[in-house]
Amino acid sequence: ICDVAEDLTKSCDLIFENNRVLNNRARGMLVAAKGKIRIKDNYFNTTGAAILFESDGKKWYESGGTSDVVISENVFDNCLYGNSENWGSSVIDMKPREKFDGEHYYHSKVEIINNKFYDNKKPLLYADNAKEVVFSENVIENQVGKSAIYQNCGKFICSDNKADEKIINL
């Protein structure tokens, strides 16, 4: 059958604050917890995705979806500068392996607010299979290509972002 069970009574909260994430092969950090997740005041400069939401219950057995994530006041500086697509396709990469069934979302709520994105050559956000995603009040400089890609999201709010000194809504 290959079903995987996760004990949600043992889920932890995560506070990842005031860190420098650089010179790391692959991704900066892997997010996989059902509790409250707060990622704040960090500096990311990574060869792959700065933040990867993984959801593998078939190969790596890392974890299930997330429920309450706030990513705020971070600096994402030239992330995804490596050449491997295996390390992510966006700075914040949220692509569960579990496909959207049309009714149930894999991730619940993810807020990406008041961050700074500098010199990123790939999309800043790829969001898939999430009930609610908020991308607001971020500063974006020297972005090449699309800033956000989203699909199968119940609600996607994108507002009051500033790109190269202009207010934009992606």
Regions found by a protein language model. Name each.
Residues 1-170:
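Extracellular parallel beta-helix/beta-solenoid repeat domains
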